[in-house]
Amino acid sequence: MLTTLLPLLPLLLPGWALCSQEASDGPWDLHMTQVSYFRNPSQVWHRGNATLGGVLTHVLEGPGRNVSIQQLQPLQEPDSWALTKIYLNRYLEEFVGLVQVVHQERGVTFPLIIRCFLGCELPPEGSEARVFFEVAVNGSSFVNFQPKTASWVAEPHAPSRVVTYTVDQLNKYNRTRYELREFLQDTCVQYIQKHITTNNLKGSQTGRSYTSLVLGVLVGCFIVTGVAVGIFLCTGGRRRC
């Protein structure tokens, strides 16, 4: 169930993480972030949003099982959006359950904040697109993805056996390396080229819808989180993974 629902996570980003909520003349971009604050194993507050070309498209905020989820752009029909919200809430329940299991197994120290920030930016014609996936734990940079080598690396200031173990695990699987790079460099960039540059964000869209893209192509991306979140949580504990 967790793997099935992970693709929905990119719809969630913290409001304070936005640089702008209006379209600009700068690089086109698709930015996604997810933040979960755990006061203790049973109390969590989720915040999130997504922006496309600087336009806020989705927001989420709330505690535990009482999360408010809103679609700010008419990207899904009411029936479809209602189903998406069900999946999102179900995912959040699974996410909290996972943290509780890891706490039981590893003795995690609370409070705990996990933040993932990823996306792609399309600069003026002729320049290479910028893609990124960054993970922070308790406000400190933890690991990031290097698309040129399709590999994860530890942040320079965070050397530890836990971080080393995490990087080793993430670099073991094609899904967390090459499939992620394909999403960031190809699917994400192509989506921006196809939809934002043709001014399709608020109008009718050709090809696959925004929702189909988000729920489909981010599977590989957020399976990364599924594989790694338990490892990330260990950084808040006193035991070695």
Curated annotation (Swiss-Prot):
Disulfide bonds join 120-188, 221-234. Coiled coil: none annotated. Residues 18-212 are extracellular. Keywords: Blood coagulation, Disulfide bond, Glycoprotein, Hemostasis, Membrane, Receptor, Signal, Transmembrane, Transmembrane helix. Expressed in endothelial cells. Glycans are attached at residues 49, 66, 138, 174. It comes from the Eukaryota. One of its GO terms (molecular function) is signaling receptor activity. Binds activated protein C. Enhances protein C activation by the thrombin-thrombomodulin complex; plays a role in the protein C pathway controlling blood coagulation. This is Endothelial protein C receptor. It comes from Bos taurus.
